């Protein structure tokens, strides 16, 4: 199973997991040479998948942070369907790209920050506070 993680906000980035293992993580500014570059990344995703020897047809799921969809331009113009219930829940969407419809989950922005902190800590239990400069736009 191949999973793409995509963030099109400031410091746009993406990662590729194959069979549960991280095989690539990329930031747009490393390609564009523009500090904190943002927006559309799919052209670069295509190139990096090709360099990793993965066809886009192998992608089973796309995950992204939902905060960018609230009143901002996330650069993910290929999102076909957006459903919002509560801002603290995962949002189920569909992405249409290269003629395929792929399941996509938008995970709350601060939950992404908290999960990274927790999983990088090697602790069984922890308390995590997240706070960033831009807010969540809702």
Language-model segment annotations:
Residues 1-138:
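Short acidic/glycine-rich loops and adjacent helix/strand connectors
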């Amino acid at each position: 199973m191949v999973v793409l993680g995509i963030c099109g906000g400031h410091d746009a980035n993406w990662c590729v997991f194959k069979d549960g293992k991280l095989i690539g993580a990329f930031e747009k500014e490393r390609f564009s040479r523009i500090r904190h570059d943002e927006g559309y990344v799919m052209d670069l995703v295509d190139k990096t998948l090709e360099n990793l020897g993965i066809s886009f047809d192998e992608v089973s799921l796309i995950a992204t942070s939902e905060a960018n969809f609230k009143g901002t331009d996330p650069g993910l113009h290929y999102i076909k369907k957006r459903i919002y219930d509560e801002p603290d829940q995962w949002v189920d969407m569909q992405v249409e790209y290269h003629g395929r419809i792929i399941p996509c989950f938008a995970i709350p922005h601060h939950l992404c920050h908290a999960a990274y902190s927790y999983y990088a800590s090697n602790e069984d239990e922890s308390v995590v506070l997240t706070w960033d400069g831009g807010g969540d736009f809702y």
